[in-house]
Amino acid sequence: MQVSVEATQGLERRLTISVPAEQIEKLVKDSLQREAKRARIPGFRPGKVPVTVINKRYGAAIRQDITGEVMQRNFIEAIIAEKLNPAGAPTFIPGSTDSEKFEFVATFEIYPEVELKGLDAIEVEQPKASVTDADVDSMIETLRKQHATYAAVEREAADGDKVKMNFVGSVDGEEFEGGKAEDFELQLGSGRMIPGFEAGILGHKAGEEFVIDVNFPEEYHAENLKGKAAKFAITLTEVQAANLPEVNDEFAALFGISEGGLEALKTEIRKNMNRELEQALKANVKEQVIAGLLANNDIELPKALIDGEVNVLRQQAMQRFGGQTANMPELPAELFTEQAARRVKIGLLLGEVIKTNELKAEDERVQGLIASMASAYEDPSEVIAYYNSNKELMQNMRNVALEEQAVEALLKSAKVTEKEVAFEEFMNKATGRA
């Protein structure tokens, strides 16, 4: 086998490989003979079909298969010999064939050489937060509101009330599509409606008819309504006030607490809040570390890896539509290219961090991650056992653990400053509620 390597552009490489022609001819001949022994063709006894007949019928297909196998096998031998690391499947182009040799070309991309830079320039503001008694009480208050019952009242509507109404919206005196409703139910303070709508309901009683003036936001989804001034003629039919459950052992029982009553509920709430806080703190720091790593390291990315990631993201997006992908048009690659490229770059950079620091997934960390995730379920032991018995899930958790270890390794050289933050403020930002 003779091999020549050509760097065409960027990460693309072109291998020209020559193998003795007799290698292919022998393989074709052997394959034809095997086929002749097992072929069943009318007019010939089993196992007695002449090779010439087999060659006439199947020779072209057999030669094509053999050629493909020879190209694949010799390609693998060539990249090993040349110490090349393909980032995707090669494209084979069969070339000339004569009595002496068979020549073909393999084109593919290689992984980039990654040299980590600027690790000591990564800046991280590490948030420090804890769950206080006041945070637990605030969560209990939220749970009370979620389990509130509502009853009609004969007073002015206030924040937190539920109201029922009929309304008709108009712009420049003309009703618009989607601007009319009957028996519409709304909780005041929920922020469901456009700015000014809920505020216009406050202070009115059931049975009143009134008009409120609002402006549609510039970013409103309907093009014909963006930034437009509108009027809503409203008939308020009912005002309902919330009746919150008392915070006692009966309240705790609503959440499956059979022993320990209210104190047991508070303990469980604190545990869940601590788990969510720990996850959010880790995610916040990781996001900053990754951002710094990306900013300080510009590397060329193999198109093959980006294309593969685009396909993954596209499939995930299709599944979010309910899995009904059969009759859906394929989503354009452009929708996912930027995100795919970012994920590929992160993977390559973190891979180099793992390699440089000789990191291996720590079993204790893997089991800790599984236990933390399982604690959110009714029977954690069942979830833990399931993960430990599933090779694919365990590999996923090892990857998560390795990523954590890589981030921790980067933190050692980063410029880290700590900042005390309140639980509610931090979690609101983390969940996008701020």
From Swiss-Prot:
PROSITE patterns: FKBP_PPIASE. InterPro entries: PPIase_dom_sf, PPIase_FKBP_dom, Trig_fac, Trigger_fac_C, Trigger_fac_C_sf, Trigger_fac_ribosome-bd_bac, Trigger_fac_ribosome-bd_sf, Trigger_fact/SurA_dom_sf. This is Trigger factor. Transmembrane segments: none annotated. Keywords: Cell cycle, Cell division, Chaperone, Cytoplasm, Isomerase, Rotamase. Residues 160-245 form the PPIase FKBP-type domain. The gene is tig. It comes from Shewanella sp. (strain W3-18-1). The keyword Chaperone applies. One of its GO terms (molecular function) is peptidyl-prolyl cis-trans isomerase activity. Its EC number is 5.2.1.8. It is found in: Cytoplasm. The keyword GTP-binding does not apply. One of its GO terms (cellular component) is cytoplasm. It holds the Pfam family FKBP_C. It comes from the Bacteria. HAMAP family: Trigger_factor_Tig. GO terms for biological process: 'de novo' cotranslational protein folding; cell division; chaperone-mediated protein folding; protein transport; protein unfolding. Belongs to the FKBP-type PPIase family. Tig subfamily. NCBIfam families: tig. Its main location: cytoplasm.
